[in-house]
Amino acid sequence: MALSAFNKLLVGGATAALALTGVAIAAGGDTSYKNGWKDKHPEWTFTGAFGGYDREAMQRGYQVYVEVCRSCHNLDHLAFRHLGDKGAPFYNEYYKNPNDNPLIKNIAAEYTVEDIDGETGDVIERPGIPADYFPPVYPNDAAARAGNGGALPPDLSVIVKARGGGADYIYNLLLGYAHPKPDDFDITPGLYYNPVMEGGRIAMPPQLQPLDGAFEYQNELEGQNPPAATVEQMAYDVTEFLAWSADPKLEARKEAGFMTLLYLLLLSVLLWLSYKRVWKRLKQPVSG
């Protein structure tokens, strides 16, 4: 009787395990569209306890954003002055206030922003100033969808934090277009094959591959010797820039954390020495 109950329990457990396995497989989805694609994992400079952003890579990445990504994607949460903050791509120690940085002023002035005329109340257009936020590419979401085949281009200012996989995902997504499509994989007209995208289909066409060998980095700051603008290099640089955009206070946070740990360490040593000194006196035998 006990053996029969044990057999039932064993069979029930095996059935439950198989059921859970089926659920896990279903949740994982069909990955045949990946066609052997293996994610690449660059050595990002901002990872680790003491990691920080690569200034030159961010400057090149900003150029890639402006000349490639800016045609569709916004930077809704980024102001021009943020580019000149400490830890930012164009930080200059001589201009603690980024609003005074001439490079930031020049960058902002390249954009046209809407404003309100203080006398008439009319909507006017003027050159941007460091305090302005990056203006939207499209006036509204409907216009953005109309210009992109019904798809809404996501805001890129926090995209690295908003996507699972973070910087690695963005980097691989930009490279994934070059991977060969399986022969039996169907693509709806207006979509493109990318094994990194869930389902293998994406509305955004290849952005960097057509520029391989045709894109040229500019020297925004003196002393730079930019590398060749290969697809991999452009993907790395623009991802570095977007990683900073999504977490601009990363370096300041790590610095504050390090100083806090140092303070706690010194405090612990002082408390231990005080403890030893106090208890040394208390442990001495009482004379008399």
Identify the residue ranges that each predicted region occupies.
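Gly/Gly-Pro-rich "capping" loops immediately C-terminal to redox-active cysteine motifs
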Residues: 77-166, 188-219
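Juxtamembrane interface at the cytosolic side of transmembrane helices
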Residues: 253-288
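Extended, hydrophilic extramembrane loops/domains of integral membrane proteins
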Residues: 204-247
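The canonical Cys-X-X-Cys-His
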Residues: 65-76, 238
